[in-house]
C-alpha cells in the first residue's frame, strides 16, 4: 500500500512535461532549432535589408521580444519552432 503513492509519482513524472523548454529556430537558416535557456520564453525573427543578397534574417530565443534596431523588422512568438518564415507572429 505504501508503494502506490511512489508508483503514481513516478508515472506522473514520466508522462508529464513539468519543465517544458521552448524550442526556437536559430541563426539565419530556418532548418536548425535549439532548446531555449531557462527564462527565454520568446522566439524572435529579425529581418533587415543589409545582407549580402539584400535580406538578412536572424532567429533565436529571448527573454522578451527584442526592439528593432535601425530599419529592421522584428517578429516574436511563443510556441515551439514558431519563428520560421511561414509562421504567424504577434
From Swiss-Prot:
Keyword Secreted: yes
Cystine connections: 24-43, 36-61, 65-76, 77-82
Keywords: Disulfide bond, Secreted, Signal, Toxin
CDD domains: TFP_snake_toxin (cd00206)
Cross-referenced InterPro entries: Snake_3FTx (IPR003571), Snake_toxin-like_sf (IPR045860), Snake_toxin_con_site (IPR018354), Toxin_cobra-type (IPR054131)
Domain of life of the native organism: Eukaryota
Name of the protein in question: Toxin 3FTx-Psa1
